[in-house]
Amino acid sequence: MDEYKNIEEKMKKTVSVLKDELNTVRAGRANAAILDRITVDYYGVPTPINQLGTISVPEPRVIVIQPWDAQILKEIEKEIQKSDIGINPNNDGKVIRLVFPPLTEERRKELTKLAKKYGEDAKVAIRSIRRDGIEKKKAMKKNGEITEDDLKSAEKDIQNLTDKYIAEIDKLIEIKEKEILEV
């Protein structure tokens, strides 16, 4: 039974990673999570931007970063420019503003493809977890630890878990696509 919990935990973690990845895909409005992967060299330590100051979303298409240490503004600005978010930071000496332009139709399609790719990667990971789980059960049967009926039952249970998490991934991707394509 612990084996099922282990498999389910791995599948949950895969879905959780997918959610984090989807949060970094920009939809029509500003989302502070888009900055989560950007780190800044702060006194020799790579530090996430959200640990260097306050991040707020005062308007639907604007993110404001207000660092606690104003000397780090230039570094934050430089790292945002180097990142792949495609936004030019506006530094006024106190805060950095990120103004998100409305998405073009072409950019929306690119982002939809990216979201689908993240979804496919997650599905591959789920199927890999299923395969590993079933292989372990087959090895147990081969060693005489479980019966043929136990193996069939285990395969069915693992497949049900797989179906559940694949459906959850499909739902997450569908929601993200609607969010991206929403004008």
UniProtKB/Swiss-Prot annotation:
GO cellular component, one term: cytoplasm
Localization annotation: Cytoplasm
A Pfam family annotated for this UniProt entry: RRF
GO terms classed as biological process: translational termination
Swiss-Prot/TrEMBL keywords: Cytoplasm, Protein biosynthesis
GO MF assignments: ribosomal large subunit binding
InterPro entries: Ribosome_recyc_fac, Ribosome_recyc_fac_dom, RRF_sf
Protein purpose: Responsible for the release of ribosomes from messenger RNA at the termination of protein biosynthesis. May increase the efficiency of translation by recycling ribosomes from one round of translation to another.
NCBIfam families found in the cross-reference section: frr
UniProt record similarity statement: Belongs to the RRF family.
Name assigned to this protein: Ribosome-recycling factor
